[in-house]
Amino acid sequence: MNSPIARTVTCASPSGLHRIGYWEWPCQSGQSQPPTVLCVHGLTRNGRDFDALAERLSHQYRVICPDMAGRGRSDRLANSALYAIPQYLADCVTLVARLDVERLAWVGTSMGGLIGMSLASLQANPIAALVLNDVGPILSAEGLRRIGDYVGKAPSFDSYEACLSYTRTIAAGFGSHDDAGWDMLARHYWVRDGARWRVHYDPRIAEPFAAAGGSGPLSLWPLYDAVACPTLLMRGARSDLLDVATAHDMTQRGPRARLIEFAGVGHAPSLIPDPQIDAVEQFLKECFQ
């Protein structure tokens, strides 16, 4: 079984320099220059969310999974107002430069998809294939409220079992998983801090999220319509963030995404079950043939 290598890259913000940690899964096929797949997580998650997907894809691809600023191994930002798409996008551009690749595939869950969509909308961007995991140019107010209810609470527990229980509650939208699957979802979401377990992200990421949520719906259709690369849209059939109408519209305009829905799943598909990994793998195979 392949294992990731922990690396870092130094990025800049208006407040100074910060390190972004990322996980590199070397390609196992022996190719001298395998295609690169960059996987970017959701709001409170981190790069280890993609372990199951990355392990499979690393048989044919070099897979890179960053912890965005304020999450996992990455530095916290001095100015919490910078926890927003423009800074994340700038950090990812720096990371892509470090990777020394001209073209890559992007797999983005929720926030990670918004970052990918933003980059793919720009001229001369490096994205050759885009996977948007349960996210689009219009986000449902219901889903945003649900996320806002827990993102800034920063709970802590005295046992990992309590962490698992809490994870099952807030991540119920990920769908049904066995015990091993829930452990994968919780293992890197929590970190031991003395006698307690705490979430592995800066609770201040909630501050700009709350401010944006209070400004009303934001349409990102101009960004989506500017995307030109092949695009796969994955949607949980019970998603409270990406509604059916928006998903359908995404198949009719812009890159005309291919839509795959997963029954019994809300926001968002975890990319742990085999059918979800199969969908990504098949799409990338077609794009890189």
Language model features with spans:
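Alpha/beta-hydrolase fold catalytic core
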Residues: M1-V37, H59-Y61, P275, E281-Q289
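Conserved alpha/beta-hydrolase catalytic His-Asp/Glu region
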Residues: D158-A210
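Catalytic histidine-centered segment of alpha/beta-hydrolase-like enzymes
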Residues: V265-P275
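Conserved hydrolase catalytic core segment
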Residues: E102-A141
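The conserved beta1-alpha1 loop
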Residues: L38-G42, R235
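Active-site loop/oxyanion-hole signature of alpha/beta-hydrolase fold enzymes
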Residues: W23, Q28-S29, A52-E55, C65-V107
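Serine-hydrolase catalytic-loop signature spanning alpha/beta hydrolases and amidase-signature enzymes
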Residues: G42-A52, V63
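Conserved serine/cysteine hydrolase catalytic core
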Residues: R192-D249
